[in-house]
Each structure stands twice: as structure tokens, then as C-alpha cells.
Amino acid sequence: MEYKTPFIAKKLGVSPKAVVRIAQQLNLTIEKNKYGHFIFTQDDLDQMLEYHRSQIEQSQNTHPTQKTSSNDVEELKTQVNTIVQNISSHDFEQLAAQLNTITRRLDRMEEQMQDKANDVVTYQLLQHRREMEEMLERIQKLEAGLKKEEPIYITPDTKPTYEREKKPKRRKMIFSIFGL
């Protein structure tokens, strides 16, 4: 029977990439179907299951579960403290120096960003000022043009708007067809 990679991955409880990796480690000849999918036989599946089980057993044997006593924990704490004390003074100085250089760089970058923001705002203000001056010039030209021309008088209508002629209502097309 033929099996595809996802099926074997489910059986082993690993990802499809891990299945291909296991097959390569076992030097299995993997065939591909016309779509490029890997095809495994029953023998390949059995070999991979055995290999996977042996790997799991080896990992469990190399990492046996140990019960730690309070004495062991105390010993580890003292070892860690001595290591930290020995390394601390020199490493902390290096870390402090690195931190200072990083903060200086950040300050410089913030200043540069602030300068750029100020430049952008200044440019926008100048552009708005230029636009306002152009609009002021246009208004002055229009005023001068109006002063040269004859005064324009606006005469009110003789009839108020509510007394004006009303447009005839449009009849809907269906009503006109049926003569309603």
C-alpha cells in the first residue's frame, strides 16, 4: 500500500518535513507521484516507525527523571551565586558601557528626527504663507478689476419666489399609458 507524507507524519506525531528528514537519514528511496508528492511503501512506514520509537527511547534514557533533593538545590544556588559574583563586576562594566553607547545613539537619533520634523513643519509653513500671499494678490487684482468696471446693481424680482409659476407635475409613464 502507498502512503503520503501527511499520513506518515500523523502516525509518527511529527511534521511532514520531519518525515522527509527521517527518510533521508534512513537512506530510503522515496518515489514521487506525478504531482511531486512523496510516496512511501508499507516497509518504509515500518522502518520509520521503528526508527522513531528508538529515537524516543534513546532520548528518554539519556534524560532520566531525577528527583532533586533540597541539598542539591542549595548547592546549585551557591554555585550560581559564586559564578555570578566572579563574572559580574567585569561583565556589568561592559554592559554599562554598551548601554551608555546605545542611549547616546538613541539620543542622537531622536535629535535628528526632531530636526527633520522641524524642517518639515517649517517647509509647510513657508508653503502655506506663499499660497496665502498668492491668494491675497488675486483678491487685490479682483478688487482692482471690480473698481474699474461699472457698478453692478442687483435688482430684486418683482414677484416673491412663492408666487412664481409652478412647474406642471410630471405624470408617471404608467399613468399616461392607461390614461389615468
UniProtKB/Swiss-Prot annotation:
This is Chromosome-anchoring protein RacA. GO terms for molecular function: double-stranded DNA binding. One of its GO terms (biological process) is asymmetric cell division. It comes from the Bacteria. Belongs to the RacA family. It comes from Bacillus anthracis. The lineage of its organism: Bacteria, Bacillati, Bacillota, Bacilli, Bacillales. Keywords: Cell cycle, Cell division, Chromosome partition, Coiled coil, Cytoplasm, DNA-binding, Sporulation. Residues 5-25 bind DNA. It is found in: Cytoplasm. Required for the formation of axial filaments and for anchoring the origin regions at the cell poles in sporulating cells, thus ensuring proper chromosome segregation in the prespore. Binds in a dispersed manner throughout the chromosome but preferentially to sites clustered in the origin portion of the chromosome, causing condensation of the chromosome and its remodeling into an elongated, anchored structure.
